[in-house]
């Protein structure tokens, strides 16, 4: 099966939904490919307090759901699929969504970023068995247990604070002595009596894959070199994200960490292909900036379609 579109949007987080809303209102009938993590990072978060327009805050999943409904109201079409290959060498661009082929005059890449893992020898074997990158998804399973959160940024503070709802004790382990988290989120975590901080410490491995559950960690103090075991029932990672851009390798420019390179805000090196949100933004990475760049990409698509037609 094959079809031809004015615009396809890859990703359904803040940037993708906003691009969908704007291109739908421009009557371009966008197709949104939802991807592996529908709703993006906001769907895995709790209360969002810094998205303007919600004085009491709004739950992340609710915010993205609202955005989607708003885009759908103007005719955006959402498809549960993911991009398996892409050819940007000529227009219309060719996308494969599994066995399904889509040609499109323009492409908006809003594929976001996914959780980073530590790369421990037994980490992958224990995902879903006590190793997690999503406190909101998995916190509930550790009611009354002692757990560990890794990281020193806002994600780690947010996860640690959230997990105190369930856990009897949360140990936040960070590889340095200072934190990159915002002052307000760090202070909130520091004031929480259930959160204990372990700094200058790295995780070397997680036990015990033979039991199919997390029983403890092998830790190393980077200052003293001491290596020791630390009992815990869960390991939550809050160590940032990696951009979902591998599929465009060789066709679009990337920086050293794999973020798509853009000029004039959202233009890639291929005319008619735009990138927005966390897949191209290593600096701001906020819901509101992702939404803003989704709007920019949509306006560029409108201009492109006016100039080049179908
Ligand atoms: P981040 O700011 O990049 O922080 C990642 C943390 O993980 C850093 O402390 C880093 O340590 C640590 N880390 C990275 N790789 C590691 C490794 N291999 N081993 C051990 N530690 C490692 O990422 P983020 O916390 O996800 O935040 C990303 C952006 O989203 C930020 O702009 C943040 O403000 C925003 N955010 C906002 C909210 C909110 O406002 N509600 C919530 C979450 C995130 P180093 O410090 O040593 O590099």
Where are the model-predicted features located?
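Glycine/small-residue-rich loop that forms an oxyanion/phosphate-binding "nest" at active or ligand-binding sites
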Residues: 78-140
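FAD-site-proximal beta/loop scaffold in flavoenzymes
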Residues: 119, 125-141, 238-289, 293-296, ...
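Phosphate-coordination loops involved in phosphoryl transfer and adenosine-cofactor binding
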Residues: 4-6, 80, 143-145, 200, ...
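Beta1-alpha1 glycine-rich phosphate/pyrophosphate-binding loop at the start
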Residues: 5-74, 145-146, 157-183, 255
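Residue-level detector of alpha-helix initiation sites
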Residues: 13-14, 37, 113-115, 154-155, ...
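A Rossmann-like FAD-binding core segment of flavoenzymes
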Residues: 71-90, 95-97, 101-103, 165-263, ...
């Amino acid at each position: 099966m094959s079809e031809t579109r004015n615009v396809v949007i890859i990703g359904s987080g803040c940037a993708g939904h906003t691009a969908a809303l704007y291109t739908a209102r421009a009557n371009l009938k966008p197709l949104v490919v939802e991807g592996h993590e529908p709703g993006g990072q906001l769907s895995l978060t709790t209360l969002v307090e810094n998205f303007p327009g919600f004085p009491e805050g709004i739950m992340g999943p609710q915010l993205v759901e609202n955005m989607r409904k708003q885009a759908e109201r103007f005719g955006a079409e959402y498809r549960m699929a993911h991009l398996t290959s892409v050819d940007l060498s000529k227009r219309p661009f060719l996308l494969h969504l599994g066995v399904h082929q889509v040609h499109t005059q323009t492409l908006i890449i809003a594929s976001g970023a996914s959780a980073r893992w530590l790369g421990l020898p037994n980490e992958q074997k224990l995902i879903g068995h006590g190793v997690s990158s999503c406190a909101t998804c998995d916190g509930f399973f550790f009611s009354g247990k002692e757990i560990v959160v890794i990281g020193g940024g806002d994600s780690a503070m947010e996860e640690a604070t959230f997990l105190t709802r369930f856990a009897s004790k949360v140990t936040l382990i960070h590889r340095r002595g200072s934190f990159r988290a915002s002052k307000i989120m760090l202070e909130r975590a520091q004031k929480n009596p259930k959160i204990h901080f372990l700094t200058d410490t790295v995780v070397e491995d997680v036990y015990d894959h033979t039991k199919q559950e997390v029983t403890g960690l092998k830790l190393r103090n980077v200052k003293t070199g001491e290596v020791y075991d630390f009992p815990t029932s869960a390991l939550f990672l809050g160590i940032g994200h990696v951009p979902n851009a591998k599929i465009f390798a060789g066709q679009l420019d990337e920086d050293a960490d794999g973020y798509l390179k853009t000029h004039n805000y959202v233009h890639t090196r291929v005319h008619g292909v735009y990138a927005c949100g966390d897949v191209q933004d290593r600096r701001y990475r906020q819901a509101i900036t992702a939404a803003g760049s989704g709007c920019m990409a949509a306006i560029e698509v409108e201009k492109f379609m006016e100039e080049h037609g179908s």
